[in-house]
UniProtKB/Swiss-Prot annotation:
Pfam family, one: zf-C2HE
Protein name: Aprataxin
Membrane-spanning parts: none
Gene name linked to the record: aptx
Zinc finger (C2H2-type) in chain: 331-353
Species for this entry: Takifugu rubripes (Japanese pufferfish)
Catalysed reaction, written as an equation: a 5'-end adenosine-5'-diphospho-5'-2'-deoxyribonucleoside-DNA + H2O = a 5'-end 5'-phospho-2'-deoxyribonucleoside-DNA + AMP + 2 H(+); a 5'-end adenosine-5'-diphospho-5'-ribonucleoside-2'-deoxyribonucleotide-DNA + H2O = a 5'-end 5'-phospho-ribonucleoside-2'-deoxyribonucleotide-DNA + AMP + 2 H(+); a 3'-end 2'-deoxyribonucleotide-3'-diphospho-5'-guanosine-DNA + H2O = a 3'-end 2'-deoxyribonucleotide 3'-phosphate-DNA + GMP + 2 H(+)
GO biological process, one term: single strand break repair
Length: 356
């Protein structure tokens, strides 16, 4: 059976083992390094279903825990799968889960060790199904006992390591998985073929799937997961990113290129903050659907200057509720606002504004 690991996207600590069917409680404290007082010491309860490849997430704290953009809700339980992100509280402190096949049988041994140390714990009450669409809870007569990360998980993991039961594959995963979420992006940042510009603070790369004739990403070398992770102390960095974006636009080799925009997606597709610098022709085979189009032509695309202003005045970035609904808006030309029923028709129309 696979082992399940909870991994801090921001790399704040080592991966945390989530034993099969054991309830693990996380929140503010040394295990997560979270110091935010809006995060309860018992903010979430996680229970891995290693044989099914998902983790049940129960919100215990008062402030919202969410999976991607979906709020779990206090007392409710939702499923989290690999590829999704768990935000412990208020869309902050992102985590992913990873399942790795256990070649040594260590899952069984670690589960038995945990059960033995906690066999006197009270049984949890049966869980109630949440009203949310993705929520699915399997109720059994006897729920697994809760365990503290500090004592049982760390003790169990230490026992596995000392007894030599941890497989080589999982051992390698432990060494490298803290940054697994952005390995592809990190590789692109370091790839001379992808780099267009770099300095000691940022690097500019070509977007792997450009949505226009010119589409670059400005990324800080510093690991920052998303807009919501930005704080006032990042203001100078974000200003520098915008300055580099303006430099890229000035140096564009195509003098006939239409105007550019530079900005951020409200909910980014990659877990490393990045500034899009994109020409407004949208002439690219990679622009294929309504989601692509609306992510750059509606308020889902937040102007770089607006982000700078929010940091200067508020010290943080606020994302409007229901931002994802903007991706479902009708297709409209961003120049004349004419509505279209499909992407091919819209692209054909764009030729009248931006001849090749």
């Amino acid at each position: 059976m696979p082992l399940c690991w909870l991994i801090s996207v921001e790399g704040n600590h080592k991966p945390i083992l989530l034993p099969h069917l054991q309830a693990v409680v996380l929140g503010r404290g040394p295990e997560t390094t979270i110091k935010d007082k809006k995060c309860s010491r018992e903010q979430v309860e996680l229970q891995a279903e290693c044989n099914k490849g998902y983790v049940k997430v129960k919100q215990l704290g008062l402030n919202p825990t969410s999976i991607d953009s979906l709020v779990v809700g206090k007392g409710s339980v939702s499923k989290m799968k690999p590829g999704q992100q768990l935000y412990i509280v208020n869309q902050l402190y992102p985590y992913t889960v990873q399942f790795k096949e256990d070649l040594s049988g260590s899952t069984k041994r670690s589960r038995e060790a945990v059960s033995e140390t906690r066999h006197n714990d009270k049984e949890e009450p049966c869980r109630k199904s949440s009203k949310q669409g993705e929520v699915s809870v399997s109720v059994s007569q006897k729920e697994a006992p809760k365990m503290s990360v500090r004592s049982n998980v760390h003790f169990s993991l230490l026992s596995i390591l000392l007894s030599g039961l941890l497989s080589e594959g999982v051992g390698k995963m432990l060494q490298g998985s803290v940054g697994h979420w952005n390995l592809g992006l990190k590789a692109s940042m370091q790839d001379p073929e992808m780099q267009v510009y770099k300095d000691d603070k940022v690097v500019v790369i070509k977007d792997k799937y450009p949505k226009a004739r010119y589409h670059w990403l400005v990324l800080p070398w510093q690991s920052i997961s998303s807009l919501k992770a930005l704080r006032k102390e990042h203001c100078d960095l974000v200003k520098h990113m915008q300055q580099v974006a303006e430099q890229m636009i000035r140096q564009c080799p195509d003098a006939s290129t239409p105007r550019f925009r530079s900005g951020y997606h409200a909910i980014p597709s990659m877990s490393h903050v990045h500034l899009h610098v994109i020409s407004q022709d949208f002439d690219s085979p990679c622009l294929k659907n309504k989601k692509h189009w609306n992510s750059f032509t509606t308020d889902y695309f937040i102007e770089s200057q607006a982000v700078i202003q929010m940091l200067e005045t508020d010290g943080s970035i606020s994302i409007k509720e229901g931002a994802t609904e903007l991706l479902k808006l009708p297709l409209r030309c961003h120049v004349c606002r004419k509505e279209f029923s499909n992407i091919p028709a819209l692209k054909q129309h764009l030729n009248s504004h931006f001849p090749s």
